[in-house]
Amino acid sequence: MNRFLLLGLALLSASAQADCAYRALAIEPETPALYVGAGERVRVEFDNYKLDGEVDSFPEPPLRIRAVQGGKACEVEGGIWLRNAVLLDAGEQRLLVQSFSGSGGELTFYDTSSCAQLARVELPEASWSLQGEQLVIGRNCSAAGLAHCVEREVHTLNQQCLPQ
């Protein structure tokens, strides 16, 4: 009887955990003025006004999230978005982007159907990573990368694949 209870609790616990599987989108130029990353159902677009040379960020709004079929789009204003920090969850319902300004940065989670902001985490330093279903943020870092951080702040992703 106890084995069945433990098995039931283990199954319940496993089903209560999120299965977010955020993955980085490759943001590539479709034209010199338009950079795009796409999943199966969602496409992310950034306007680019620096038409010569390599681009590592997009300082001009808006960021557009567009359905691949039907073309319906919504827009996010503001931000200087990093090209190498655009992630889409496995269900393509949430988009995670890193942005920065002169005073710091942030990670922002958006709903891909409405562009509504779902969550935001401040990044006084740029060191962070997704490790399974946890968002790990480095604090008091001497260099880039979590290995160089004195402190680590861990946010477990909830059922909606958002940091708690």
Labelled PLM ranges:
Residues L6-L9:
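Sec-dependent N-terminal signal peptides
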Residues M1-F4:
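Positively charged n-region of N-terminal signal peptides that target proteins for export
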Residues A18-Q164:
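Exposed acidic/polar residues on beta-strands and adjacent loops within beta-sheet cores, strongest
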Residues S13-S15:
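N-terminal signal peptide c-region/cleavage motif recognized by signal peptidases
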